[in-house]
């Protein structure tokens, strides 16, 4: 039966795809949102497959647990240098060279906190990367020759053996916390002197020191995050703000309770917001109030969290997107031992996307790029979201966008759907499945997208009072893009 366009009485569109929204059930929510989606990009009006992954560096024969990059302020033309901790050693990799070079070894931990800074060496300014952990104390990698030096901190007799788990930078000083035996203490160095932490009695503003903030509840400081013009100091149950420019004006104030213990490796800041994972979901602190983002918007997804596995959660923030790797069950009976899902939260647009198919062990946001290690291949550092890649190391990824149920007027039966959209792909003949599902049955048409951008018109003959649209691809490791949304037209019969 041929259908002429004049016979269509109804239409709906997905005008500007946004993300996953599960706060209002699965029926008649705004069609800009998917009730279920995975591995989809929606920025700037696109509905597209997510970028894939690629190998970022030569493999290192040990499990990388820290990755950082030199900030080349003094020698901006030099090749990028990356620093990794693995197997009790520190390695460097200079972009464009053969591989990793071991610079020092014999460390007890591979999980280091780091800050970039500079120091003087023979009258010249040198970039340094300062690293610390609670077992090994502080070391520094020098940008001039990539040597590693152990640093014995000058803190004063009372704190001779302090080793910081976490470092921060604020008011031209290095800050440290998480030292064993000092759960309530935050230390700060002298200005521009990162290895001297003693006070100066005559001129306190030029000295280092310590701020003590007991909460008498067994809690301890786990993170220091620069935030606007001040520093956030985070305990598992409480967020504190440190303000001021020197010791005479430093103040620490309790800002907010965190709504249950915060997962240490999930804390990230992005210009105007701090994000973290707690028992009740993803929290956002904007300097004034605390909001739970995921409790509603990702209700179904977070309901399937694997209990007892939040400690494996890892996060980073890059270009205003918060990436959080977690264990999310597919079915109630699943037992997971490693992260299988990444939740992406766009802090500017306020939208969520779910990523599947990667088993993230650790995340690293370095120099505007997201890197990660996989649970099954921790020796490799992979690039996350590589625009040149349409799959996972060349293997296809499954992309899905599923609208909520739409009744489009309960009094009518809908039939004979026509979908219209404009699309292209990274290769020719990339199959994308277009499915209309009604309460009666579902029907799928496979559309082969081409490199050349084209307009498509897809007829699907199926009927029902309620319907949903599913867009899915899984056959080729090639990216695809739909521009300007999808329009669906259909005929109506009174029920």
Task: Outline where the language-model segments fall.
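A short, charged
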Residues: 126-130, 135-136, 161, 166, ...
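Beta-propeller and closely related beta-pinwheel folds
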Residues: 53-67, 104-112, 148-313, 350-356
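Membrane-entry segments of alpha-helical transmembrane domains in multi-pass membrane proteins
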Residues: 78-81, 127, 225-228
